[in-house]
Amino acid sequence: MLSKRSLRVLKWGRCEAAYAAAYPKVPDWVLNFSPLPSLSSPHRDFSAFPAAQSEHMQQKMSENGAIPRQGKVLTVDTMNANVKKVDYAVRGPIVQRAVQIEKELKEGVKKPFDEVIKANIGDAHAMGQRPITFFRQVMALCTYPQLLDDNKFPEDAKNRARRILQSCGGNSIGAYTTSQGIDCVRQDVAKYIERRDGGIPSDPDNIYLTTGASDGIVTILKLLTAGEGLTRTGVMISIPQYPLYSASIAELGAVQINYYLNEEKCWSLDISELQRSLQAARKHCNPRVLCIINPGNPTGQVQSRQCIEDVIQFAAKENLFLMADEVYQDNVYAKGCEFHSFKKVLFEMGPEYSKKVELASFHSTSKCYMGECGFRGGYMEVINMDADVKAQLTKLVSVRLCPPAPGQALMDLVVNPPQPGEPSHQTFMQERTAVLSALAEKAKLTEQILNTVPGISCNPVQGAMYSFPRITLPERAISEAKAKGQAPDMFYCMKLLEETGICLVPGSGFGQREGTYHFRMTILPPTDKLKLMLNKLKDFHQRFTQQYS
C-alpha cells in the first residue's frame, strides 16, 4: 500500500510528464520546485509558477486530458453519437406539436376545432377502449390483497390473484421477481403457445418475460450486434417499418438493411425482394438478422402460411436469425386471412428447418383486444439458441433485475384467461368479442371512406390496428415542403393537425419508396369519432389539393 505522499508524488510525476511532452527541455525551476502543489483538489495550484509558465502549463495539460476543460461535461458534441442518429416518428415533431395545441386549447386559445384527435399511436385505452373486467379485477387484488376478503370479486379472479401472489417474494407484487420472469407465468405462457400452435411443445426455460415486446426485441438485437466495417451486423427490416427497429439499429451501431413490401399486392412480402436486398447489403456489412412483423405495422397486412414458409426457407438458406414480431396475433379481420405463428410453421416444416433455424418470437399485453399498454407486459420465446449464448442472454436480462411484476401478472391473464365453467368466462368472452368485432368494423370503414377521396388510396386493413394510405400531393405542395426542409408528407400532416386537430404520423417516419407519400392512422377511436375524423380528413385533403394545385 503506497503512502499518501507517495501517491501525490506519483500523480505529480504524471503531470510533469504531460508538461515534458509539451516542452522538450524542462526548466530547472520546475524540477527543483518545492513544496508539491496540492493534487487532492480538482483545481491544481499553479500559483507558485511564473504567470506565463503557469498559464501555458495548464493549457497544455488541458489539451492532453490531464485537466478537464471548463463547461458542461455532457454536450451534443460529447454525447454518444449513435443516440443522435435515433429517430422515433410515432412520438416525433407532429406529436409534440399536438401536445402544445392541447395546452393552448385548455388555455382558451381559439382553434378551428375543439379537441386534438390522437390517431398517431396504437394506445387503445387512451382512445376510449374499456379495460377487460377480469384483468382489472385480478390486478386490483394483486396490488391490494386485502380485497381478497371482499365478496364483490368473483372466486376465479381471487384464485388467480392468490396463485400469482404466492409466486412473488413476500406474497407481494411489489417485490423483485426472478430475472427471467415469475416461474408460474412462464409456465402459463408455454402452455398458451402449445395450445395456439396445435400441441407443438414449448419449454418454459425458453420463455423470457419482458417489459413489453420492445424490450425483448432490443435485447435480442444487442446479442446479435457485433463486428466493425464489412463485418458489422446487418439487420433486414421491412419498409415501411415500425420505427422501434430503425431506432434500435441506430442506437446499437448495427446496419439497417431495407427490404420493400409490395404496396400493389396489399403490402405483401416478395422473396425476390429479400434476395435483392441481401445481395446488395453484403457489399458493405454482414447480414445476420431478418425481422418480420406479422400482422404488419404500419401496413396492416397478414402474411399467408406460404409466405411464412418461404421466409423460413430463405432464412435457413442464407443463415439468418429470424425475429418474429407477433404482437397483433389476435388482430385479424379480413376474410380468408388467418394468423400463423412462425414457430408453428417452422416445426410443421420438419426437422430440416425446426432443428436449424434460430428464431425469437415476441408478444405483448399492449395490443390485440387487451390494449394494456401502460402495464408494459410481454414475453419472448427463443428457439434453437446456442446454449452458451442463452446463458449470456440470461445474464443480460439479469442486469436489469426483472420486468415490472404487474406487467408479468397481466401477461399471465392474457395467456390464461377465464376458462369455460368459471364465473368470469362469459363476461370475458363478451368483452373480448366486442372489442375485436368493433375493430374489424372500423378497419373496413376506414378503407371504404378513404378510398372515396380522390388522391388517397388505401389497401385493405387485414389486421393489426392501422391503415397506411398513399396520398397524392400537388407539385407546389412538394416544392413548398422541400423549401421548408420538411418531407412532403410531414408538411401535409402538420397542416392537417393545425387545421383539423387530427394527429397522424407521416409515412416518411416509417420509410417508403422514393416519390411516394403516406400517413399512418390508427383505427382505435370510437366508431362515431372515427367517422368524424375520416370525414374531416376527406374535406381537408380536398382543400389542400385545391390550395396547392
Curated annotation (Swiss-Prot):
The modification N6-(pyridoxal phosphate)lysine is found at K367. It catalyses: L-alanine + 2-oxoglutarate = pyruvate + L-glutamate. Pfam families: Aminotran_1_2. It comes from the Eukaryota. Its cofactor is pyridoxal 5'-phosphate. Pathway: Amino-acid degradation; L-alanine degradation via transaminase pathway; pyruvate from L-alanine: step 1/1. The keyword Transferase applies. Its EC number is 2.6.1.2. One of its GO terms (biological process) is 2-oxoglutarate metabolic process. GO terms for molecular function: L-alanine:2-oxoglutarate aminotransferase activity; pyridoxal phosphate binding. Keywords: Aminotransferase, Pyridoxal phosphate, Transferase. The keyword Iron does not apply. CDD domains: AAT_like (cd00609). InterPro entries: ALAT1/2-like, Aminotransferase_I/II_large, PyrdxlP-dep_Trfase, PyrdxlP-dep_Trfase_major, PyrdxlP-dep_Trfase_small. Catalyzes the reversible transamination between alanine and 2-oxoglutarate to form pyruvate and glutamate. Homodimer. Belongs to the class-I pyridoxal-phosphate-dependent aminotransferase family. Alanine aminotransferase subfamily. This is Alanine aminotransferase 2-like. The gene is gpt2l.
